[in-house]
């Protein structure tokens, strides 16, 4: 038996144990939604007495739910804000942070779009409304239709920070309530552009290579390039919980961070917190 397979088997056996409490609620980031759903199903198969419900809505929605006690774990693609942390502490709750994976953010366009790559500066100009036609970046003579996540999304905030340099998005940007809505809109609109987590990529949209050195080198979004640190748009993904609730949520968190959980993380299209991508 290979060392990796043995480690995976031991990891599974360790988590075939009774859950401390039978039900957990997890809410928040759409980026983390597919990963958490897959891992929750895997965990419940190993622990039939456990019940985990997972819903999206965005990082801000998840953290708000944690603050008002309507979720046990908040999924977030951004760090908790100082104001959110302060509000929890004022209510005598202590927020705890766990990194469960990393994610590469992919820039997507319609598959028929001839453009294959963009610089960070070009992306900034597009999402700020300074570049409005694809011919300005080597494409066809067609209007650029720009899609973004809503302001409650951690991905919205990360893109603003990493790509726009904390400058404002264009006022006429089309805000989507979920990542799936961006995928669907870009798929159906030939002049569209948007951004999604790597795990959401499919054959119906085209991911672009990105340059963060003013066009000298372009790198395609992939797990391998993210692990090698050659792809520039990578961020950590978080779970937040109330410290008083740690006994309830810790078994599932430990499972995610185990060898079995991290192998599944890689298979779904996220970057593990371990080095398991290196064979």
Predicted regions and their residues:
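Generic N-terminal leader/processing signal
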Residues: 1-2, 25
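Bacterial N-terminal signal peptides that target proteins for export
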Residues: 2-10
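Enrichment for repetitive, rod-forming helical segments
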Residues: 10-14, 34
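Hydrophobic h-region of N-terminal signal peptides that target proteins for export
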Residues: 13-22
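Exported/periplasmic ABC-transporter solute-binding proteins
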Residues: 22-279
């Amino acid at each position: 038996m290979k060392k990796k397979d043995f480690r995976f088997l031991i990891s599974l056996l360790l988590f075939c144990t009774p859950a401390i409490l039978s039900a957990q609620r997890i809410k928040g980031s759409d980026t983390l939604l597919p990963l958490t759903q897959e891992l929750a199903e895997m965990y419940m198969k190993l622990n039939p007495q456990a019940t985990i419900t997972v819903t999206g809505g965005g990082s801000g929605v998840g953290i708000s739910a944690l603050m008002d006690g309507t979720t046990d774990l908040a999924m977030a693609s951004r760090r908790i804000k100082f104001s959110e942390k302060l509000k929890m502490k004022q209510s005598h709750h202590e927020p705890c942070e766990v990194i469960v994976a990393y994610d590469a953010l992919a820039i997507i366009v319609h598959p028929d779009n001839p453009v294959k790559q963009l610089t960070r500066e070009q992306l900034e100009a597009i999402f700020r409304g300074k570049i409005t036609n694809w011919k300005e970046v080597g494409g066809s003579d067609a209007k650029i239709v720009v899609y973004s996540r809503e302001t409650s999304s951690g991905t919205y905030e990360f893109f603003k920070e990493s790509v726009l340099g904390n400058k404002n998005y264009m006022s006429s940007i089309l805000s989507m309530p979920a990542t799936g809505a961006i995928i669907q809109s870009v798929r159906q609109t030939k002049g569209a552009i948007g951004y999604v987590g790597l795990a959401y990529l499919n054959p119906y949209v085209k991911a672009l290579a990105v340059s963060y050195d003013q066009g000298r080198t372009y790198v395609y979004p992939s797990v391998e390039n993210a692990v090698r640190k050659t792809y520039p748009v990578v961020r950590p993904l978080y779970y937040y919980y109330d410290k008083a609730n740690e006994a309830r949520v810790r078994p599932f968190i430990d499972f995610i961070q185990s060898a079995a959980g991290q192998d599944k993380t890689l298979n779904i299209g996220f970057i593990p917190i371990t080095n398991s991508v290196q064979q």
